[in-house]
């Protein structure tokens, strides 16, 4: 994945955290990563572990490995302009029980910064305590979990609620990426709270 930002684009000068671990759905990491680069931002891969992480393709086949830029324990939300959370069942299941990841996610909401989550990534939003009263979407199997956590779940390709962008699956990536760039370009959302 490229890390060079386009200097003449709407996100020039912005830095975006991508929170992922082993088992991340590869296209849900690489597609938004390339979209923010094309829009001028610098993406940073944040993970519970240092070194590299290995992606999956459709949760079954091993994908490529990606170099971690910083650990979630060392990362601080104030150093980023927004957060993207790719899915992948294994990735999301590991991330949602990681206390450092939960705190990192919650800090973006407390600082009113844009957050984007696709597929199974909203599991971590539940554990971070930031979905109650929110309108969002996810992979359909998370519907009950999100409703039980107080969210209003809808079946739409992309949903934006005060700086929180969510989508259902890789099929929604074009719409997801466009909204990620739009929300990041708008900057802080004062109604984005934990």
Question: At which residue positions do the language-model features occur?
Answer:
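Anionic-ligand binding patches
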Residues: 136
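Catalytic nucleophile serine of serine hydrolases
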Residues: 119
């Amino acid at each position: 994945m490229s890390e060079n930002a386009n200097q003449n684009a709407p996100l020039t000068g912005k830095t975006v955290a991508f929170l992922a671990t082993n088992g991340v759905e590869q296209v849900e990491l690489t597609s938004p990563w390339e979209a923010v680069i094309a829009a001028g931002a610098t993406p940073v891969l944040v993970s519970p572990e240092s070194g590299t992480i290995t992606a999956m393709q459709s949760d079954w086949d091993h994908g490529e490995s990606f170099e971690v830029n910083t650990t979630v324990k060392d990362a601080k939300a104030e150093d980023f302009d927004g957060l993207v959370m790719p899915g992948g069942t294994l990735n999301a299941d590991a991330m949602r029980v990681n206390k450092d990841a939960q705190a990192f996610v919650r800090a973006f909401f407390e600082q009113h910064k844009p957050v984007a989550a696709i597929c199974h990534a909203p599991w971590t939003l539940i554990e971070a305590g930031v979905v109650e009263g929110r309108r969002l979407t996810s992979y359909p199997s998370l519907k009950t979990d999100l409703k039980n956590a107080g969210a209003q779940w809808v079946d739409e390709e992309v949903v934006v609620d005060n700086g929180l962008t969510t989508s259902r699956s890789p099929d929604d990536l074009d719409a997801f990426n466009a909204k990620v760039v739009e929300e990041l370009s708008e900057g802080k959302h004062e109604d984005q709270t934990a």
